[in-house]
């Protein structure tokens, strides 16, 4: 095998690979063995005609397609390894020369991993990130717990007031016609919750059980449905029942009922501690992100478009998986958000480019600093993943994970170690 390498443009190379005629003939014979049974030649049983007869009857090129594939599968990986070429996508293969008794020559044009010029990555200055737990946040959490433990009872007499729960039947009309999704029976709505559009809920205040009313509202311009966006609508509403919520008192008894604590003060203290922990983790994550962004700003990379497109495709697949868990699909998502595949991909583009750039920088720093994942770290990471799967035999599952996902685990571990290095060497400023 002979290989010539030509730089076509930035991050794109063309390899001209020559396979000697003897090797190519072996590939043709391999192709013949694979396809022999499909050839039907007069005077021979199907699949029994010899190679020289097949070439004569069908022409020598009949076996070239698979022969080309066999040659490329064998020689292309060796060619890129020998020339230290790191492709980011599949190559474009073009045949230069092919024929009986000739060397097989082909070109492989491929986009390569770009050069990363690191700037300063140790000692970057990043603004300190910190959060304080406000008393109001603690009180809001207590109110939320109060709401979850409210007692609900029927309101035997009287009108709907804010804070009441109305059980209603409704049917909506736009342009005088009923629309899909605009009708429900025995629907519970808390007045003042903002569940419905516009002032729908406010217009129910003052109504009594069994009373009906026409409620007039307008859909928001960006409601998410082309047939409803910005349009006025009329709803025929009937009050079936009215319920009232009784909130429990915020006292020591409440704390005992909803938690492991004996006093309200102990419950408040626990809520505050949990919030402090959450905010501390949030501040840490934001600081780490700011450090990486500062390092990225100092680096120079010309990212090939194909890498960004591949990352966008990965992001779309992730979105599709998340939607599937919710019982939805991409088509429904596009309709609901008044979007399209093209719009969503364009929206993802900036994030995709940022991710690719960050990954390349982290890999380059790992290379410069000689940061690697040890076998022990791989095992520990796999054990963590195995525990998340809830498997009984954790060690066996971890072993399978290492074998199947070693490359992904290594990247995760190495990136984590690089991040620790960057944060440890950063300068926190006020």
Curated annotation (Swiss-Prot):
Q: Which GO terms describe its biological process?
A: 'de novo' cotranslational protein folding; cell division; chaperone-mediated protein folding; protein transport; protein unfolding
The cross-references to PROSITE patterns, in alphabetical order and at most eight, read: FKBP_PPIASE
Name its cellular compartments: Cytoplasm
Establish whether keyword Coiled coil is in the entry: no
- UniProt GO MF annotations: peptidyl-prolyl cis-trans isomerase activity; protein folding chaperone; ribosome binding
What EC class does the entry list?
isomerase
- Residues covered by the PPIase FKBP-type domain: 163-248
**Assigned keywords, A-Z:** Cell cycle, Cell division, Chaperone, Cytoplasm, Isomerase, Rotamase
Quick one: a GO cellular component term?
cytoplasm
Q: What is known of its domains?
A: Consists of 3 domains; the N-terminus binds the ribosome, the middle domain has PPIase activity, while the C-terminus has intrinsic chaperone activity on its own.
Q: Which family does it belong to?
A: Belongs to the FKBP-type PPIase family. Tig subfamily.
Q: What is this protein called?
A: Trigger factor
Q: Which organism is it from?
A: Clostridium botulinum (strain 657 / Type Ba4)
């Amino acid at each position: 095998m002979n290989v010539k390498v030509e730089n076509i443009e930035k991050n794109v190379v063309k390899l001209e690979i020559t396979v000697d005629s003897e090797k190519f003939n072996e590939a043709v014979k391999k192709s013949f063995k694979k396809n022999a049974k499909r050839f039907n030649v007069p005077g021979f049983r199907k699949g029994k005609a010899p190679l020289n007869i097949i070439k004569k009857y069908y022409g020598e090129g009949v076996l070239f397609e698979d022969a080309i594939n066999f040659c490329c599968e064998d020689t292309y990986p060796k060619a890129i390894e020998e020339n230290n070429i790191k492709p980011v996508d599949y190559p474009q293969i073009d045949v230069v020369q092919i024929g009986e008794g000739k060397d097989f020559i082909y070109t492989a044009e491929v986009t390569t991993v770009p050069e990363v010029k690191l700037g300063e990555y140790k000692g970057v200055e990043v603004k300190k990130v910190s959060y304080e737990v406000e008393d109001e946040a603690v009180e809001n959490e207590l109110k939320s717990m109060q709401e979850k433990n409210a007692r609900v009872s029927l309101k035997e007499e009287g009108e709907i007031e804010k804070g009441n729960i109305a059980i209603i039947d409704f049917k909506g009309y736009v342009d005088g016609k009923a629309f899909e999704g605009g009708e429900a029976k025995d629907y519970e709505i808390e007045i003042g919750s903002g569940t419905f559009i516009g002032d729908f809920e406010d217009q129910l205040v003052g109504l009594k059980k069994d009373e009906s009313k026409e409620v007039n509202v307008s859909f928001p311009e960006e409601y998410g449905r082309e047939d409803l966006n910005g349009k006025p609508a009329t709803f025929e509403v009937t009050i079936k029942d009215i319920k009232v919520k009784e909130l429990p008192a915020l006292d020591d008894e409440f704390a005992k009922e909803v938690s492991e604590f004996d006093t309200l003060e102990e419950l408040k203290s626990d809520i505050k501690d949990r919030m402090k922990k959450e905010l501390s983790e949030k501040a840490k994550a934001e600081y780490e992100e700011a450090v990486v962004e500062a390092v990225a700003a100092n680096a120079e990379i010309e990212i090939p478009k194909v890498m960004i497109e591949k990352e966008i495709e990965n992001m779309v697949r992730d979105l599709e998986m998340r939607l599937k868990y919710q019982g939805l699909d991409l088509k429904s998502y596009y309709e609901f958000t008044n979007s399209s595949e093209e719009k969503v991909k364009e929206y993802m583009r900036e994030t995709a480019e940022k991710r690719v750039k960050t990954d390349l920088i982290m890999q380059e720093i790992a290379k410069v600093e000689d940061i690697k994942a040890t076998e022990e770290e791989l095992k520990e990471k796999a054990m963590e993943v195995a525990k998340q799967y809830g498997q009984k035999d954790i060690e066996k599952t971890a072993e399978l994970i290492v074998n199947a996902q070693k490359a992904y685990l290594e990247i995760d571990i190495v990136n984590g170690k690089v991040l620790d290095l960057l944060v440890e060497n950063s300068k926190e400023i006020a």
